[in-house]
Amino acid sequence: MLLDDLYEIVEPITADLGYILWGIEVVGAGKLTIRIFIDHENGVSVDDCQVVSKEVSAIFDVEDPISDKYVLEVSSPGMNRQIFNIIQAQALVGFNVKAVTLTPVESQTKFKGVLERVEGNNVILKLDDGREVSFDFDELKKFRVSPDFS
């Protein structure tokens, strides 16, 4: 699978450069956009993104993991970061989040609340109305931090 191949190539590069690979997203049809999200304990600057982009581009030119034309984007995950895996979810317990499920849960697919806890591969949200709802992480289409600025 393309995404697995990209992780295998990109993760060692980011680690060697001192960054955490937060996630990779592949979007579009025809001309793909490859989005690489990096993090660092001291934050991520535009210069950091340029360094990673240059190194990844050089390796992609050699390894050629994508046969079609593509656009490469490197950025920080940002404040409203997407949560790519259960380990990231565990680290974000207590944060406000938004979730979109692949199939309806309690007749809805969009949820907003506090990430209350993680149990195995399940994430439990406390919704704004006080209810708790549980999702298998693999059933989430989108899952991201939703900063509260109030």
From Swiss-Prot:
<keyword id="KW-0963">Cytoplasm</keyword>
<keyword id="KW-0690">Ribosome biogenesis</keyword>
<dbReference type="Pfam" id="PF02576">
    <property type="entry name" value="RimP_N"/>
</dbReference>
<comment type="function">
    <text>Required for maturation of 30S ribosomal subunits.</text>
</comment>
<dbReference type="Pfam" id="PF17384">
    <property type="entry name" value="DUF150_C"/>
</dbReference>
<dbReference type="GO" id="GO:0005829">
    <property type="term" value="C:cytosol"/>
</dbReference>
<dbReference type="InterPro" id="IPR028998">
    <property type="entry name" value="RimP_C"/>
</dbReference>
<dbReference type="InterPro" id="IPR028989">
    <property type="entry name" value="RimP_N"/>
</dbReference>
<dbReference type="InterPro" id="IPR036847">
    <property type="entry name" value="RimP_C_sf"/>
</dbReference>
<dbReference type="GO" id="GO:0006412">
    <property type="term" value="P:translation"/>
</dbReference>
<dbReference type="GO" id="GO:0000028">
    <property type="term" value="P:ribosomal small subunit assembly"/>
</dbReference>
<dbReference type="InterPro" id="IPR003728">
    <property type="entry name" value="Ribosome_maturation_RimP"/>
</dbReference>
<comment type="similarity">
    <text>Belongs to the RimP family.</text>
</comment>
<dbReference type="InterPro" id="IPR035956">
    <property type="entry name" value="RimP_N_sf"/>
</dbReference>
<protein>
    <recommendedName>
        <fullName>Ribosome maturation factor RimP</fullName>
    </recommendedName>
</protein>
